[in-house]
């Protein structure tokens, strides 16, 4: 496991940024890429959809809803069976994280037009490089 039994938020964003950078490079080369590490907010998903389009790749948001009880059962089982590959999550943490999650709506799931970038950013690439500090703002020259 990368960070022992901890979940350091300052490191997670750096790792995710590198995964996004690598994945987009693979997509540029014409291979399929699946990102599966949360995307808790519409802005995260919109930025990645936009960047995928900028590199000439097709993107699709897939959402598999899960109720709290089943999620808690899976989290507990994962820690019990493979503690070296995960970290402990309390009920309070799990509830806080569930409350932060923004489920995709039907338009997002259909792949509708990507919403405008939040007003404090010039491009989705800029937004993404601030969200994931290790992701370079290399797509800024492409239209927003």
Regions found by a protein language model. Give the residues of each.
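Aromatic/hydrophobic pocket-lining residues that form π-stacking "cages" and hydrophobic walls in ligand
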Residues: 22-23, 48-50
